[in-house]
Amino acid sequence: MSKRDYYEVLGVGRDASEREIKKAYKRLAMKFHPDRNPGDKAAEASFKEAKEAYEILTDTDKKAAYDQFGHAGVDPNRGGGYGGGQGDFGDIFGDVFGDIFGGGRRGGQRQAARGSDLRYNLELSLEEAVKGLTKELRIPTLATCDLCDGSGAKKGTSASTCTTCHGQGQVQMRQGFFTVQQPCPTCHGRGKIIKDPCTKCHGDGRVEKSKTLSVKIPAGVDTGDRIRLAGEGEAGEFGAPPGDLYVQVSVREHAIFVRDGNNLYCEVPISFSKAALGGEIEVPTLDGKVSLKIPAETQTGRMFRLRGKGVKSVRSHAVGDLLCKVVMETPVNLNDRQKELLREFEATLTGESKKHSPKAEGFFDGVKKFFQDLNS
């Protein structure tokens, strides 16, 4: 069975803190613990799944490997991978008492494992995420060996029945008063032995390979979105189904725009004269420049909304807006004539601050009252 994403298992986001991960695990462990659900196989499976996810995501090294490579990064059967702890008291006592009372629950030949899921972290520009595109991705993976067609045996030969377990994949061992059933150490639970391994894959049935995929990225994706490509993960063992490929999207910061859901935000500088007298300015959008009418006496920080100039949702197809915040820019590098004109203008305002600068007048009146109250 395909493994679910560990963050999805615990019901937390990819940016969850260790405390949030522990809290989520505790809640699931209380809900699905075998002692609370005797005989419930589904609850037992959910408990083990949550335990495995918790052990990976609370280990710094394992979490880093999982975030980069998905389940393949923590697969103990791959070089450099980390193994998630999957054993618990249920495994031990299930084997012991299962054999005493008539056959262990895990008896029989081990099934060939489905291929591991892969994750590819894809970084996009804002323009690419908003408009969509097709990306060529080069994916390192395990592919079915083309020399032995995934059997692991040398061409012209086939696997033979294991003489240790006689094809059962399990052996019984005495431990004190108990008989314990364990995977066969000779064939590793497969029930078959490859005497003449393939010269290319050395008996594994799979080889390391890189493949190139053309992946269509839909318009409107955002950081945190995930695209699933069924069957594009690692090849399964000895003919088992392949895993899936998950493309994890992240969007780079933009020099002009900030995205919040389907809306875009930007700051647009305007001159003092334009803010005071009004007029038209050019505003950037992802589709090009548009004109924006600025009313006279516009204050810095005022927000203008351009409807339909945001992002089209990848799910609902609703289109967001562009919100432009105008910021008045103080002129610099003035020449003598310009400075003189500003002084003349300032002089015309003397004694009329309430009329021309009501906010400033109100502010200084408040400051004056504050100190009067302080000294009274």
From Swiss-Prot:
Q: Which UniProt keywords apply?
A: Chaperone, Cytoplasm, DNA replication, Metal-binding, Repeat, Stress response, Zinc, Zinc-finger
Chain positions recorded as Zn(2+) 2 binding sites: C162, C165, C184, C187
State the Gene Ontology terms under molecular function: ATP binding; heat shock protein binding; unfolded protein binding; zinc ion binding
Q: Does the keyword Chaperone apply?
A: yes
Protein family membership: Belongs to the DnaJ family.
Assembly and binders:
Homodimer.
Quote the protein name from its UniProt record: Chaperone protein DnaJ
To which species is this protein native?
A: Shewanella putrefaciens (strain CN-32 / ATCC BAA-453)
